[in-house]
Amino acid sequence: MPPAHPRYAAERSDLRDRLDAATARLDPPFGVVDLDAFDANATALIGRAGGKPVRVASKSVRSRELLRRVLARPGWRGVMAYALTEAIWLAEGGVSDDILVGYPTVDRTAVAKVAASPELAAAITLMVDSVDQLDFVDAVTAPDQREPLRVCIDLDASWKLLGGRLHIGVRRSPLHRPEQTGALAAAIAARPGFRLVGLMAYEAQIAGMGDAPPGHPVRGAALRRIQARSLRELIGRRTAAVAAVRRYADLEFVNGGGTGSLATTTTDPSVTELTSGSGLYGPVLFDAYRAWQPTPAAFFATSVVRRPTPDIATVHGGGWIASGAAGADRLPEPWLPAGLHLLGTEGAGEVQTPLAGSAAAGLRIGDRVWFRHAKAGEVCEHLDALQLVRGDTIEDVALTYRGERAPAFL
């Protein structure tokens, strides 16, 4: 019996029929979330977390309505925001009273607003990795003239070899060794106006790197070996860093992991909570994971507007490219109907995208082609709303950040 996954031809055909029927009165471009897939992914992610709570990564959702939907489910607790201005907007909108800003901030207006509000100061935790950031905050608002600010230390989770000459992972925090983390904890504890409540270590080389890249089995096997060794190293170092920090503060949480590493990060006894977001929408990049692949749940529709040749169909738009190192894996994928691909010489275009493949000849002017974005929340930068589909019916409409006319957080 084949897995219940829309990558299989019959199920993809059924999905196309359902989405076309549900949105028949809408004109592309527009976005859709398949609620059955979204909810199933939310449940599966909690199952992979092994009993630890999961904080939802807002950058991978970018819709307050869908964030509320996730947080109403068992196992999900709190938000990881990507900007302090966003965290304020989410808190004031009643999305959550537990928001961790995943990155340092130098937004003076936002810092001053949090510092002046007992409610915001209690709900929002700032990220720091250096004394310079503490100095910046103090320059904005004096310690004796503000609410105590909650802070979390960001530990570098990358794997360094050969004395640091070989770096595997991303360039985030300068704090790599436990003693460095402990030193910052001591500095925070000695300063008025701050309260150290958490530690975070995001293992991007495990959580954000697919270990089964299509067509590259040797590379995949090598990645899995590297990831396993990196995880072993990180568990020991993160445990030591947590111990060093706990000498100066009674931590409320130790955060780690992402969609691609929930099942492994949860095995680290020093970690008390996890983070996930991309797995809710199931974007293309997560097709390259072996242990678990989310069911595709988010799509955007385009229309066929021309037929330059009998075997090519061209859609209007389509070029919604993902961030990160430039490459083919950042392109959106034409998903429905099955049997379409981008042209290597043109890719996904700003205004039009030609498509070839076995399904191209059967497409007519006005037909729809459904794409999946390479990443998750970034698709919402192009959309005012997401049509929430269940079966072949639009059950509701969720505004995106853009649709709510939110400030430009990034």
Residue ranges and their predicted role:
Residues 294-301:
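Short coil-to-beta-strand transition motifs
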Residues 57-203, 208:
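Active-site-proximal beta-alpha core segment in soluble small-molecule metabolic enzymes
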Residues 307-410:
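C-terminal accessory subdomain/extension
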Residues 21, 26, 30-31, 48-53, ...:
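Hydrophobic/basic alpha-helical segments enriched in Actinobacteria
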Residues 1-116, 404-410:
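A charged N-terminal "starter" segment
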Residues 157-282:
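Active-site loop/helix belt of alpha/beta enzymes
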Residues 23-34, 97-101, 119-126, 166-175, ...:
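Glycine-rich tight-turn/loop motif centered on a GG-T
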